[in-house]
């Protein structure tokens, strides 16, 4: 009986371990500048993750993202993930995207290298963000550009916001005040 109980406990612990780490701090992604964005370096700050595009009706949200980043950067990191998943609204190279964001919106928050946020080639970090069994909180479907995920200081999921929720809306800012 003790033997069966031990096996059951080990099996449960293994299943829990395989279920995923409920912290985004396990991820490292390629920066648009060619280096690495290490999410473990953001421990102690909230993180807002956004899939972005340069030729989208929501592209002006870059301005609000930068404004929020500048105002709350002592306790918030914003990481943009350019993606070309929706009507090819992010066709440029990493260099072109970086130049556009800096020149047009003065973006200083970290931008990752262009990735896929949906489909068979979804980047691992976006699989984690959109899958409850991975992030421990919610399932989300990325339906368009500028969807946002807010994570707490421990890298745990707080909330998901669709494209229509602007970065400077009270829906997001209430978590930062």
Give short role names for the model-derived ranges.
Residues 18-40, 123-124:
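N-terminal "domain-start" segment that seeds a small globular fold
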Residues 24, 95-144:
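Short, internal strand/loop/helix patches
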Residues 43-47, 55, 59-84, 102-105:
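Conserved helix-turn-beta segment immediately C-terminal to the redox Cys motif
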Residues 75-93, 108-119:
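Thiol-based oxidoreductase modules, predominantly thioredoxin-like and allied folds used
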Residues 31, 51-55:
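Amphipathic alpha-helical repeat scaffolds
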């Amino acid at each position: 009986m003790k033997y069966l109980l031990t096996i059951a406990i080990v099996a449960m612990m293994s299943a829990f371990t395989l279920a995923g780490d409920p912290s985004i701090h396990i991820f490292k992604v390629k920066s648009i500048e060619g280096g690495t964005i290490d999410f473990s370096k953001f421990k102690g700050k909230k993180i807002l993750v956004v899939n972005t595009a340069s030729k989208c009706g929501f592209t002006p949200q870059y301005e609000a993202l930068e404004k929020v980043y500048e105002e709350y950067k002592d306790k918030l990191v914003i990481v943009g993930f350019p993606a070309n998943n929706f009507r090819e609204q992010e066709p440029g190279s990493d260099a072109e995207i970086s130049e556009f964001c800096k020149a047009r919106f003065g973006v200083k928050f970290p931008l990752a290298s262009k990735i896929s946020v949906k489909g068979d080639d979804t980047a691992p970090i976006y699989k984690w963000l959109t899958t409850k069994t991975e992030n421990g909180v919610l399932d989300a479907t990325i339906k368009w550009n500028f969807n946002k995920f807010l994570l707490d200081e421990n890298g745990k999921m707080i909330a998901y916001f669709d494209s229509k929720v602007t970065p400077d809306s009270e829906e997001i800012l209430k978590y930062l005040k």
